Amino acid sequence: FGSDSISNIFSSGKSLEAIALASLVSQGLLAYDKKVSEYWPEFGAAGKGELTVADLMRHEAGLAAFKVSIDPKDLLRENIKQNKIGAIIESHPQSFRENGSEREYHAVTRGWIVNELFRRIDPEGRTIGQFISEDVNGPLGADIFIGVDETHIPRVVPVTPLPIRYQFKESLKPSIMGRRIERNIFQTASRL
């Protein structure tokens, strides 16, 4: 690990998504109170027509998980621009928690949805990764990536997962005893 290493920032990337959308708002191209389907008509399919940009950003889209498998190749920039992920999002219905709450953390899916929205509104049709590279990294001399190309792979630090025994043990701890994992293994399994 060195000063030029690239490490996964996981959910900290949501701040980059917010910056990208705020850029569109500042240009008058996007409004948080508008429906996502006003910018991306196909998104309104499967009962999602009333969902606003603000709902999406507050993790209230009802799209916290998809009931389909995503081919990792579909996440490559050229496939994103061919609407591989967008088509999945368009056809997917909303699904809310059993407790009736509309809010559920969209750990992975929000980034995909926001990226699809962004690229449809951006005058150049860029992905958020391209926006960060061109409009943030260049002017600020930053070194941030959403998606890396082959030239940067040697700089990427691999993610080392916590040992499964630790995860299992922590998942069984009652919340009152400082459980560090949101759901225990049985709650997670019941949602699959």
Where are the regions that the model predicts?
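Active-site-proximal loop and beta-strand segments within enzyme catalytic domains
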Residues: 1-108, 116, 186
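Penicillin-binding protein/beta-lactamase superfamily catalytic region
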Residues: 134, 150-192
